[in-house]
Regions:
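C-terminal motif of bacterial Sec signal peptides marking the signal peptidase cleavage site
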Residues: 20-22
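Bacterial N-terminal signal peptides that target proteins for export
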Residues: 1-11
């Protein structure tokens, strides 16, 4: 009689154990999925920056980046930019050395004469260093688009130039997030631009 009761007791314990285990796993699953999905949503939340004067929009991550615009006076580059927008990491943007820290993405706008082809303009501006790989880029509203890649060089080693009748837009990503922001760049249709003051 004792063997039977012992077997019965064992099977009872197995049953109870099994029930507890299955309850535990469902609780764990519910908890797991809710914690997994929430942080992803927060980091991916992007805001759109729209520049009506120069006719473009770009999405960025406001939690991580701050948008800084340089006045044309500050942009002592050749050729000289009429507008420059930098997306700087927030932890770097507060310091004194903000101008020396690379941004996530830099967008520069240059005026262009429409009769010149984009690659001629890049060449004459010294923006195609030796060893550059050049490929074409397509985007709505863009007449010509070129990507200049320098594989031998550390970042920034990718430069995207997009041209319409009035401007050349230069986009330079410095990191992976900058690359994502670059891919969100769009030109505004003519109707939604502010009319240029000449």
């Amino acid at each position: 009689g004792t063997i039977l009761s012992r077997v019965g007791w064992f099977s009872m314990m197995i049953l109870v154990g099994g029930l507890l285990a299955s309850c535990d796993s469902t609780v764990r699953q519910i908890g797991k999925s809710s914690t997994e999905s929430s942080p992803v949503v927060q980091t991916e939340r992007r805001e759109k920056h729209t520049d009506h004067t120069y006719g473009f929009t770009v999405k960025y991550y406001p939690k991580e980046y701050v948008l800084l615009t340089d006045s044309p006076i500050q942009t002592a580059t050749q050729p000289s930019a009429v507008q420059r927008v930098r997306f700087q990491r927030k932890d770097l943007a507060t310091g004194q050395v903000v101008d020396h820290e690379p941004p996530g993405l830099m967008i520069s706008v240059f005026e262009r004469s429409p009769e010149r082809l984009l690659h001629e303009w890049l060449d004459s501006s010294g923006l195609v260093p030796p060893g550059s790989e050049i490929s074409s880029v397509r985007l709505t509203g863009v007449k010509e688009g070129l990507r200049v890649t320098l594989r031998q060089q550390p970042a920034p080693n990718e430069f995207v130039y997009l041209a319409n009748d009035q401007y050349v837009y230069s986009l330079v990503p410095y990191d992976a997030q900058g690359g994502k922001m670059l891919r969100s760049f769009r030109l505004l249709p003519d109707s939604s631009r502010a009319h240029m003051r000449h």
